[in-house]
């Protein structure tokens, strides 16, 4: 974090003792010409880590300084101050016990929390011509590194075109913006999407296969941005009208009959077969070896989706003809 001046090991005074001192220090409010800058080390800090607000180009003849949380300079936002004469540190109402003030005006914040993000104001008081003081105010904004977001859903398994899904980008983070992507692109302009006022929540109306995702959300502040892992909705749909393969209908006695049925469905559909209105078997495939003319009739494949409750069926008329055997003609002996 760079060299620091050791914090004074002298008397610590509670903020109430600052009332008179603060009024005197703030009496003169003239602009300063010192090019004071404040730098965060490290530039991006994660929650739970430490950050140093390092002050550069501190002016000479320093009388003292005051740190405020935010840009309002009052006792409520007062964190700490340092008085050069006597090396006195004074703590205010905004002091959390995690701040350490140094004689070079730098401020160490330990175990950073979300509440620590935001602007800080450094009030520097410099000795003047012996009768007046010169003060300057320098504002710095601390940005926490955005956490990796995640997407929570009110329903990860919606029924197609029937249910509304609410996606939320977590966590809720102050002083950040939220943005959403679908299929790696910005959200299309459609009545099926609606965002909350903060963009943190996305409403999906009547989800279809075209709006099932994948979805990503991003949390961004002025210092960093982080994007979530993609989330794809498991869209429950179907079954569509089933298809029987092969569609061949004419057979001969002694042939093997093999039929397969398929319907697009999520979750996979349940299959059953009937022949001439009589249940034959369950399953997607039907196999009957060495069929006879008795196997002629109407073959129906029925499908059902247990999740959507939808059903569908299709039929195939099979005709089985008797085999015709061609015998050998007798040899005619010439006379």
From Swiss-Prot:
SMART domains: IG, IGc2
Cell compartment(s), UniProt: Secreted
A family per Pfam: V-set
Positions bearing carbohydrate: 61, 104, 111, 199
Chief location bin: secreted
Keyword field: Disulfide bond, Glycoprotein, Immunoglobulin domain, Repeat, Secreted, Signal
UniProt similarity note: Belongs to the immunoglobulin superfamily. CEA family.
Entry annotated with the keyword Cell division: no
Start and end residues of each Ig-like V-type domain: 35-144
Listed name of the protein: Pregnancy-specific beta-1-glycoprotein 2
Sequence ranges assigned to domain Ig-like C2-type in this UniProt record: 147-234, 239-317
GO biological process, one term: cell migration
Highest rank taxon of the organism: Eukaryota
Keyword hit for Secreted: yes
Cleavable signal peptide: 1-34
Disulfide linkage: 169-217, 261-301
GO cellular component: cell surface; extracellular region
Organism: Homo sapiens (Human)
């Amino acid at each position: 974090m760079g060299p620091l001046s050791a914090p004074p090991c002298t008397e610590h005074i509670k903020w109430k003792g600052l009332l008179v001192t603060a009024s005197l220090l703030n009496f003169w409010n003239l602009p300063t010409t010192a090019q004071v800058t404040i730098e965060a080390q490290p530039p991006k800090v994660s929650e739970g880590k430490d950050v140093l607000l390092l002050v550069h180009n501190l002016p000479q003849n320093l009388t003292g300084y005051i740190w405020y949380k935010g840009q309002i300079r009052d006792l409520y936002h007062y964190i700490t101050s340092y008085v050069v004469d006597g090396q006195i540190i004074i703590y205010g109402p905004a002091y959390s016990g995690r701040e350490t003030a140094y004689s070079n005006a730098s401020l160490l914040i330990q175990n950073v929390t979300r509440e620590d993000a935001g602007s800080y104001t450094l009030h520097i008081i410099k000795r003047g011509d012996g009768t007046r003081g010169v003060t300057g105010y320098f504002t710095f904004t601390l940005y926490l590194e955005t956490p990796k977001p995640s997407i929570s859903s009110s329903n990860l398994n919606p029924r197609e075109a029937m249910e509304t899904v609410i996606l939320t980008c977590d966590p809720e983070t102050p002083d950040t913006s939220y943005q959403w992507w679908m299929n790696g692109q910005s959200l299309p302009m459609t009545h099926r999407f609606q965002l909350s006022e903060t963009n943190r929540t996305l409403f999906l109306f009547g989800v279809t296969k075209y709006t099932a995702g994948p979805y990503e959300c991003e949390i961004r502040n002025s210092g960093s941005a982080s994007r979530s892992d993609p989330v794809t909705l498991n869209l429950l749909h179907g079954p569509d009208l089933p298809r029987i393969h092969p569609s061949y209908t004419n057979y001969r006695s002694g042939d093997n009959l093999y039929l397969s049925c398929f319907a697009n469905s999520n979750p996979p559909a349940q299959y059953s077969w009937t022949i001439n209105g009589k249940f034959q078997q369950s399953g997607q495939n039907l196999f009957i070896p060495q069929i006879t003319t008795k196997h002629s009739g109407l073959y129906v494949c029925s499908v059902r989706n247990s999740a959507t409750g939808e059903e569908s069926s299709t039929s195939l008329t099979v005709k089985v003809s008797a085999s015709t055997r061609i015998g050998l003609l007798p040899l005619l002996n010439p006379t």
